[in-house]
């Protein structure tokens, strides 16, 4: 069939591709430990699930405004502002079914054909896809392992030009777990003001940090008016299947993004939004407990990976991923990922699922039980001993 250029460059996400392979092996009788998909292993917290169930029983199953229910927008504005030391209004908040619309729609609203967009590589695959759909020119900036997988600022400075329209940040990062330091954010902010570009800050993992909070570029002088914050409920509140996210941006841009929602998605399910309201306004002890458990799993996984021959793993500061360097194994990331799946029954992702600069790395998700993580380490150790 003859398709438009907007879709001919799109490719599947590597995580779903690997999941399909792993499930095929499971269907054939092989036991698989799944460390490839980035979603919490715990169910949605009980108070949130109960709020959603109650909303359905009470008849909250009708359309809502495209930008979301006003009480939820206000609650998010207050909560997100308090956590960042900023003041947001409800008019700056737009609600959608998941966080991805707030990667995609601001890009569609801002990027013109031929505009250049700088994004992290390795990084979330949707970044490059949405830039291309918008007609922009994607320019990858490498992440430096020796600087906690922060931007290579020498490359970044070379990429910035009068054609730069948007820079995408992700901190804490998928796939690396790296947190961008304040000094790097300050350099990017200075460049944004000097060259007059926007920043799209993907902060979906902002609550999942293990040592110190992840700073937001929106807090720096002159940046609130040129920053879009993308966040959501999936990772923090174990609500991946509920599909609830939001963007925070200047009101004029929020109006345009709302129009894109109106003419595409329509609105977000009302009962999902009511569950989200409980998530924001209800007790946060479950989040704190989950973060503490993730920290414990992270430490055990990193220690175990560093005992494997040819593997070197930095301790991530946020998110729930590790991104070990496997160049010492002498094979490509794709080969090692396939080998571990077939020989060890452990599903994980090659670094190249996140861009060309992911070569030499693997991504493993530790949002899984400690028992499975320890079993996976034992299986990997056994399999790698046989590697030629």
What are these regions, as identified by a protein language model?
Residues 35, 57-63, 74-83:
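Glycine-rich loop-to-alpha-helix module at the N-terminal edge of alpha/beta enzyme cores
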